[in-house]
Structure formats: structure tokens, C-alpha cells
């Protein structure tokens, strides 16, 4: 049980469940409960890959900053164990998304979002373009659900998803901003600083609410 909790924590369980719940809610509104549960499960698998790849890549940096809440740093699981489980789950997640309830089109779009999450972990977090994978992935999520139930996603939901995704990106890095700079992680929030990031997040949320409730 302790290992399972450690793997869940390494997958960034809170954000993973938020994304999964959003997918389930959209699917439930558009289709049946069975479809929604199936879609939520496939989305959950993709989020596991993103979270685990993040902790694998950040392992040395987490050690440097003594982030003892991270399972790899705490020693609850080893990096070889996490890598092994990640590589086992990658083909499972790909197959479940392409052959499951999302279908080829919806599954392909969602996997694009998963790819963006992994690309952020390994590359974009160091770039001024760090918001880009968030913008794409958070538009891909609702789009994939719409395609999964044979519906065309409206433009407003794609824009709303992108804006909220970028806002989350700016807020999510605030807690580690100074440590990120020490580690030469130069994403856009790190370059703009704390208060500009908070202000930009607020503006993005306001604009996204306009698109959401203006329909």
C-alpha cells in the first residue's frame, strides 16, 4: 500500500485527478455514464505518464533542493522502479486511448496533449515558450472528449481550456520560483517573476470566464 501511495504521489495525484475529473464531467454532459467512466480512465492513464516523467526528470534537482515529500527523494520508491513502471504504462496508455472510447481521432488528440506535457517536462520548462504546451494540452483535453462522442468541439471551449491551462502554469510554478532560478529553469513565469505571473494568471482567468459564461 505504501508503494501504491508513492507511485500516486509521483504521478502528481492532485492535478492528475483534477484533469481526469474534468474529462469525466465533460464526457458525462455529452454522453452516457459508461462512456464518461471509460474516457476518464484513459485520460487518467495519460496523466500518470506525464506525472511520472516529471518526477523522473526532476529527480536530481529534487535531491539538490531536498524536496523530501517527493517519493524518489524520500526513498519510498527508486528511480529504476519508477522508470520501469512508466515504460510499462506507456504502451498501455497509447493503446487504451487509440483503441478505447476516445477512438482514433479523440485518442490521437489527447495523446498530443500528453506529448505536450512530456515535452514541457524535458524541454519547454527551460524556454520562454513554456506556456505553449499547456495551451495546447488544455485545449486538446476537451477536444478529445468531444471527438470521442462524435461531436465537434466549439471554439470557445478550446480557447477557454488554453487560457486556463496557461493560467495554471503561471500559478503552479510560484511555490518553487526561487529554486527554479537556482536550477537555471528559465520558463516564462521564472523570467517575469512572481507578481507579473500572478497578474497574468488573474487576467487569463478573467478572459477565460468571459468565454465560458458568454456562450
Q: Which residues does each PLM region occupy?
A:
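Multi-pass alpha-helical membrane architecture of UbiA-family
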Residues: 1-215
Amino acid at each position: 500500500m505504501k508503494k501504491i501511495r508513492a507511485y500516486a504521489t509521483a504521478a502528481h495525484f492532485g492535478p492528475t485527478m483534477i484533469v481526469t475529473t474534468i474529462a469525466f464531467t465533460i464526457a458525462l454532459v455529452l454522453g452516457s455514464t459508461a462512456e464518461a467512466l471509460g474516457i476518464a480512465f484513459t485520460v487518467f492513464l495519460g496523466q500518470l505518464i506525464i506525472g511520472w516523467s516529471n518526477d523522473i526528470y526532476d529527480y536530481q534537482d529534487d535531491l539538490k533542493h531536498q524536496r523530501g515529500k517527493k517519493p524518489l527523494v524520500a526513498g519510498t520508491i527508486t528511480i529504476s522502479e519508477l522508470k520501469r513502471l512508466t515504460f510499462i504504462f506507456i504502451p498501455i496508455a497509447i493503446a487504451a486511448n487509440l483503441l478505447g472510447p476516445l477512438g482514433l481521432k479523440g485518442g490521437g488528440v489527447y495523446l498530443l496533449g500528453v506529448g505536450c506535457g512530456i515535452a514541457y517536462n524535458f524541454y519547454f520548462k527551460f524556454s520562454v515558450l513554456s506556456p505553449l504546451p499547456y495551451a495546447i494540452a488544455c485545449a486538446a483535453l476537451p477536444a478529445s472528449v468531444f471527438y470521442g462522442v462524435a461531436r465537434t468541439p466549439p471554439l470557445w471551449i478550446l480557447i477557454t481550456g488554453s487560457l486556463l491551462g496557461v493560467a495554471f502554469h503561471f500559478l503552479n510554478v510560484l511555490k518553487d520560483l526561487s529554486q527554479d532560478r537556482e536550477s537555471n529553469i528559465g520558463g516564462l513565469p521564472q523570467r517575469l517573476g512572481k507578481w507579473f505571473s500572478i497578474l497574468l494568471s488573474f487576467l487569463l482567468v478573467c478572459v477565460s470566464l468571459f468565454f465560458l459564461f458568454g456562450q
